[in-house]
Structure formats: C-alpha cells, structure tokens
C-alpha cells in the first residue's frame, strides 16, 4: 500500500505541476512584489489597531459604509473604528459577563479563558441600531447597540443593560463554528445550540415569523457540520420566493466507501418557511442541500478533490439575483496538502436544486437518482400566490410534499465550478489559506477579479487569474505578498470596501487596514508598470499610477496597461534595451582577490523575472552568457565566484527577462587583484608607514562596534583574514584617483543607489542587502 500511495502522490504532483506551471513565460508562482510589515508602515499603506486593554480576541467584524465605521466584536468588548484610519478615533463598549455567570461556567468544567463574553454576532438591525450577541460565559446573550442616525452622531452604547437570552442565535462555545445573517427582522443562524456543542441546527429567531429550526438528531440534514457562510439571494422579483443559502462542510452519508469523508454543501431554504401543519411542525419544510465540488480534472476521469470549505465570498454584480460565489477550499487527503479557489455561478447552483433528488431505498442499497413521482408543490419551493400560486404558506402544503421533503433533503447532482476547474491551486505548503475577499476591476483590456487571500501567518496575497479560452488553461498571477501583521498570526476575518479601495483584516490580536494598491512601488519606468500586470495601475506617461477607466477621473489620455499579457515591449515601444543600448547602463565597479570568493550583487525588483548574466572580456565587443558550474554559482542575491580566477575579470551584465521583455538591471566591471600583490603590499607596510603613506586617514566609515556585512559573508565562505581585506578596501576608497570614479559608481561594498540607503534603518546599513534597486 505504501508503494501505491507513493506512486499516486507522484502522479498527482506531476499532473498538478504540468497543469498549473507549464507554458508560462514568467515565474508567476512567486509574488512580483513582497512587502514586509515595516515597509507597509513606512509607505503609509497600512494602519493597525491594537486593543488598549492588551487583548482583543476578535471573533467578528461588520463594515458600515454609511456610518463610515468598522465594528469589531472581541472578548467582553465591542469597538467602533474609523474606516478612514482605524487606529484613530475609536469608541468602545465594555460588555463582560457577570461574576456569577463566570463562576458557574468555571464550576461546570470550562477554562477561565472560555468563561467570558465573546461577541459573535454583529448585524445592522436598522439605521440607528446594531444587533449583537455574545457567548456570555457559555450562556448566550443578545442586546442592541445604539449607533446614531448621522455620521456626526457620537452615540455608541448598549441600548439597555438588560440583555435577552441568545440561545439559537449565538453559540455557547467561543470556538464553535457559526454563521448568521439578518433578513428584515429575522435572524437566520447555523450553529451548535447546546452547552456541549452536540446539537447542530439552522435556526430562525426574532421578527414576526415563528421561531423554527432543523429537526433534532437527523443526520440526513446535518452531520457534524462546520458552518462557513450564509447569504440571502433572491431568485426573482417575488419577495415570497427569496431563499437563504448556507455554505458548510459535513460528514457525507452518501460516501459509502469512506465513512469519514468530508463534503462541502450548499443548503437552501425559503425565508418565509413556517413549517408544516401536521408534519415538521416548527421545523424547516423547504430545506434542501447539494454537494459543492472543487476539483482538478485528472487522467482517466480521476479528479483531485478539495473537499473542505475554508471560506466563501459573495461578489455582487449589477444583477442582484446572480452574484458570483468564490469558495476557498483545502484538501482532506492524507496524500498531499493543498488549497484551491473555485468560482460558481448561481445558474449552476439553481440547476442542481431544480434537478433530481438523491434516493436510497434501504441500508443495503446504493444512492441513486429518485425516479418516482415528485409531489406538488415541488419540495424545496417557496409558498407564494404570485402568478397564480395555490399556497400562501408552507402550512398549506399537502402532507405528501412535506413528507417527501423530510426524507429527500439531498440533491443528486453536484454543483461544479466555472470552467470545471479551480481558478487557483496552491500546493507548495508554504502557508495555509484561510480567508478570501474579491474586488472586480475594470482594466484597459477587460474586467478582472482581484483576489485578496488571507493566510495563517499574517500574510495577504493579492492575486489575479487569467483564463485562456483557446488553451482551456488558467494562469494565476501573484501581484503582491503583503505581511500585514508584525507577528505571523492567522487571519480570521476580512472585510472589503471597493468604494474606499481598502481591505480590513482581523486577527485574534489586532485589526489592520491596507490599501489595494501602491502603484509607484512597481518602478519609475513604463516597462516596470506594464510588467506588473496590476489592473489597478497603468503608465500615464510620467509615472505608474492608479488606472481609471475612460470617462471616470481620467485626466490623461496616455494610459499604457496590459494585464492579460504583460507585453511591455509593445506597450513601451522604444524603451527596451537591445544591442548597443546596453552600454548606456550606469557602470558599477567591484574588486575581487584572486583565489578568494566574490559576489556580484544583483536582485531585480520583480521576483517573477528570470535573471541572465552576460560577460564582456577585455576589449571584446561580443557578450557571452555566463556559464555556471561548481565554481561560479547563480544565486538569488547575484553571481557568486567561489574561487576567483584572473580570467574572470571583465564587465558583467545582469539582465532580467519577463514576458519576453529584456531589461539590464546592473552593469558591473570586475577587477581581479592578484593574491601575491596583495600579500606583498601588506607585508611591506608596517603600522607607522601605513598611516604616513595612506592618502587619507585609515578610518573605517563603519561605526565602531558595527560589523560590516561583508565580514559575515567572508566568514561564511571561509576567508578569515578580515583585517587585510578591510585595509585593502580602505586604500581603494581613499585613493584620489578612485574617489572621483566611484562617486557615482560605488564599489561592491557600498549601496548602488542613495535611495536604498534612505530606505534602510541604521542598524542595517552594513548588512547584506535583501535587494537592489534598478540602476
């Protein structure tokens, strides 16, 4: 079995790699830009809110564009933060459990940390109030928060100190899976409704309609579910036909060969469902569910499934009846770990619910299509008298229709994604994907969905996917990797504001906001901007700036952008370096000692670019590609000579290739000093003569106590005579003949660009640079 599993693993990995990376001209599996938490702060692109009490324990967030506030529910507290800058002008409500409740909770065997009031529900009840519910030390409670009608209204307080019971509206356990949505005055919630988290159910409470729930202990409806998301999506203009969709995972009864199989489901029920008259009294009579599939097609019809839903995002469109559903999945397989994002259209979801029902004749039978007569009205349909409907309420439904709905909640057809495959697959295991938010953007060459994906280590990935209809393939382009939080904490909630172009990100310890884009980070040239393929950004003839579609804030007609292909050569005609134009690149000077190691630094801004080194020897005009071997190694930081030969002297060109665009990042002239001459020079010099003969004082420009980064590097490669190297470098720096030449072209130990020095903090000035800027 082990060998068979190993073979399957190899086949899966090989197929995935071929499918998702083959044929790409650029390495789009890496982000084009990687920005640290510190860099985001320095760019003023992010703002962080920390609780003044030292703890937050965030569990829910609510975005209010009208009030321009972000409401945050944590442990014993509700915060109101400014959407403009969340770290400024916050308000808070302290809402702890009573001492008696906390004591009772601890006496029942719960930890003291669990016996607090964790806020799990925040919904707009009306223009002036929020509905909020908390776990209440394992005794759920609900209340209303007064927020005021106008933006200038400073109100933010609990409407009454007296709280209502929250059972069926909020879970007992702060860590239990839970979803809810407020429709009118009715709260729909999927949760575990008991103290021990055993009774999983979907509830409707509050409002004018009767309180209602799924049946107790019926595994055909829910079997150990994990609730992920819920939305009200209308089918048509008839409000009586409105339905609520629940997204969850559960143990699958129909997976007969695998008793532990986990499937993702879409559950659906009617908003106006009031249960049956004699059967399913005060129980849902319209509840149906279907399997939601996200899989990579495989050979011989064997798919690789991503069965466990992590997060779901509903992207509104101009047609409010047909939003686009984005699902973030992971695998439950023991063979390999991976994540995928699939997209679903409402037409596919409705087709599954309008299709055949799944049926099992008995314990010894297999699941199959129900081929008998389906009663009228069709089970799962809503009660409505519009267009001649006969039933005004589900209590009027015939018993056989209610009985059929009770015994056949599962649809036979699974819901498959658009293009029959995921739009994104990640199997590198670098981090786990946890949250997703999507913004739809108009670009010069079409419409793109920008995915913001939160991970379990505080990072947000900004990604676009491009479908090639002719090849039936999907290209994923990771535009940016943003380290949102200083510490690698899981991202547990995200809210998006397309209006403000801001993403609001919640972790257990802090809340952050980050702008969608910072276009000038891509570079100051047309090619850099076009190669970025960021639909938010375009070259305006002067700089890389925010792109606006024609007619909306468009101040300049000169807009160059190519998101689909990233063809900078075509968009930026005349700027590509070819032939003798390479000689226009500014020259840098580097020295190396024969038989020692030397690094020629070159790190392009884009992590997706392929680096190629060329060398020009002596007076030759011909440039040859550098051949790497055991002695000459191409690294992420540049070209490393482990043992320098005199024949290595020459002019080296560091070129990047990205989507067929060739760009010279750096031109370095390497001079090799004979080892014997260096030894002779230092042997002749004693300490007194050295001070007399040096053209300038032998003072290191490095502050006392600081360790030059090149010493650490030399130590790594085995060179131990640091003093001689430092003395030699001091001579080079202090020679009048060299000073003038090196003023604009620093040696390899200096920064190539003064801007880079400004960007670094003082302790890092003499550390090994992580990257170099374009010349």
Swiss-Prot record:
Q: List the disulfide bonds.
A: 105-115, 133-142, 270-382, 294-342, 519-537, 654-729
An example Pfam family from this entry, by short name, is Sema
In residue numbers, the region (Disordered) covers 742-775
Q: List the Gene Ontology MF annotations in alphabetical order.
A: chemorepellent activity; neuropilin binding; receptor ligand activity; semaphorin receptor binding
Indicate the secretion signal residues.
1-25
Family statement drawn from the similarity comment of this UniProt entry: Belongs to the semaphorin family.
Q: Name it.
A: Semaphorin-3E
């Amino acid at each position: 079995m082990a060998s068979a599993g190993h073979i399957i693993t190899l086949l899966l990995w090989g197929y995935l790699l071929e499918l998702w990376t083959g044929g790409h001209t650029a390495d789009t599996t890496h982000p084009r830009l990687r920005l640290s938490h510190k860099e985001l702060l320095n760019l003023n692109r992010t703002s962080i809110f920390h609780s003044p009490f030292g703890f937050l324990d965030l569990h829910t967030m609510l975005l209010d564009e009208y009030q321009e506030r972000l409401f945050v529910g944590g442990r014993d507290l509700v915060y109101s933060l400014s959407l403009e800058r969340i770290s400024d002008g916050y308000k808070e409500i302290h809402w702890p459990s009573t001492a008696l409740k906390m004591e009772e909770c601890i006496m029942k065997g719960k930890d003291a940390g669990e016996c607090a009031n964790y806020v799990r529900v925040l919904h707009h009840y009306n223009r002036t109030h929020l509905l909020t519910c908390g776990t209440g030390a394992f005794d759920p409670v609900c209340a209303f928060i007064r927020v005021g009608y106008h933006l200038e209204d400073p109100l933010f307080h609990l409407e009454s100190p007296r709280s209502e019971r929250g059972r069926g509206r909020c879970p007992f356990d702060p860590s239990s899976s839970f979803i809810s949505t407020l429709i009118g005055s009715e709260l729909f919630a999927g949760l575990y409704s008991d103290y021990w988290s055993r009774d999983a159910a979907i509830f409707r409470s509050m409002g004018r309609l009767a309180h209602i729930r799924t049946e107790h202990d019926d595994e055909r409806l829910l079997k150990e579910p994990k609730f992920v998301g819920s939305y009200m999506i209308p089918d048509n203009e008839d409000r009586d036909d409105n339905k609520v969709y629940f997204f969850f995972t559960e143990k699958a009864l129909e997976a007969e060969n695998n008793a532990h199989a986990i499937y993702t489901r879409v559950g659906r029920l009617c908003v106006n469902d009031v249960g049956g008259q004699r059967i399913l009294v005060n129980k849902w009579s319209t509840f149906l569910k279907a399997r939601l599939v996200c899989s990579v097609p495989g050979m011989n019809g064997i798919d690789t499934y991503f069965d466990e839903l992590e997060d779901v995002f509903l992207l509104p469109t101009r047609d409010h009846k047909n939003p686009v559903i984005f699902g973030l999945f992971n695998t439950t397989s023991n063979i390999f770990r991976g994540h995928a994002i699939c997209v679903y259209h409402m037409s596919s979801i409705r087709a599954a619910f309008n299709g055949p029902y799944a049926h099992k004749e008995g314990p010894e039978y297999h699941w199959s299509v129900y081929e008998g007569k389906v009663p009228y009205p069709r089970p799962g349909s809503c009660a409505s008298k519009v267009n001649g409907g006969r039933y005004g309420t589900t209590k009027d439904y015939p018993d056989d229709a209610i009985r059929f709905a009770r015994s056949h909640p599962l649809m036979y057809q699974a819901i498959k994604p658009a293009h029959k495959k995921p739009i994104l697959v990640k199997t590198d295991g670098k981090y786990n994907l946890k949250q997703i938010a999507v913004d739809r953007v108009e670009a010069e060459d079409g419409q793109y969905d920008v995915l913001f994906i939160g991970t379990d280590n505080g990072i947000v990935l900004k990604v676009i996917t491009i479908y090639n209809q002719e090849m039936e393939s999907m290209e994923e382009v990771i535009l940016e990797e943003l380290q949102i939080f200083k510490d690698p904490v899981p991202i547990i909630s995200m809210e998006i504001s397309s209006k403000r172009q801001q993403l609001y990100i919640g972790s257990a310890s802090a809340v952050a906001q980050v702008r969608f884009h910072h276009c000038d980070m891509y570079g100051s040239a047309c090619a850099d901007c076009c190669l970025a393929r960021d639909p938010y950004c375009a070259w305006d003839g002067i700089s890389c700036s925010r792109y606006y579609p024609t007619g909306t804030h468009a101040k300049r007609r000169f807009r160059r952008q190519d998101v689909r292909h990233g063809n900078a050569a075509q968009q930026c005609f005349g700027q590509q370096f070819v032939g003798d134009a390479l000689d226009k690149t500014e020259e840098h000077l580097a020295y190396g000692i024969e038989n020692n190691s030397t690094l020629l630094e070159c790190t392009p801004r884009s992590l997706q670019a392929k680096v190629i080194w060329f060398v020009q020897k002596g007076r030759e005009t011909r440039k040859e590609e550098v051949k790497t071997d055991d002695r000459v190694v191409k690294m992420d930081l540049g070209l490393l000579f482990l043992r320098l030969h005199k024949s290595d002297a020459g002019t080296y060109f560091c070129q990047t290739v990205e989507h067929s665009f060739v760009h010279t990042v750096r031109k370095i002239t390497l001079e090799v000093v004979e080892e014997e001459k260096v030894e002779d020079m230092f042997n002749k010099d004693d300490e007194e003569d050295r001070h007399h003969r040096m053209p300038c004082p032998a003072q290191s420009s490095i502050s006392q106590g600081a360790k030059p980064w090149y010493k650490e590097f030399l130590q790594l490669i085995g060179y131990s005579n640091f003093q001689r190297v430092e003395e030699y470098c001091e001579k080079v720096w202090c020679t009048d003949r060299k000073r003038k030449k090196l003023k604009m072209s620093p040696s390899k130990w200096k920064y190539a660009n003064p801007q880079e020095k400004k960007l670094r903090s003082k302790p890092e000035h003499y550390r090994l640079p992580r990257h170099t800027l374009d010349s």
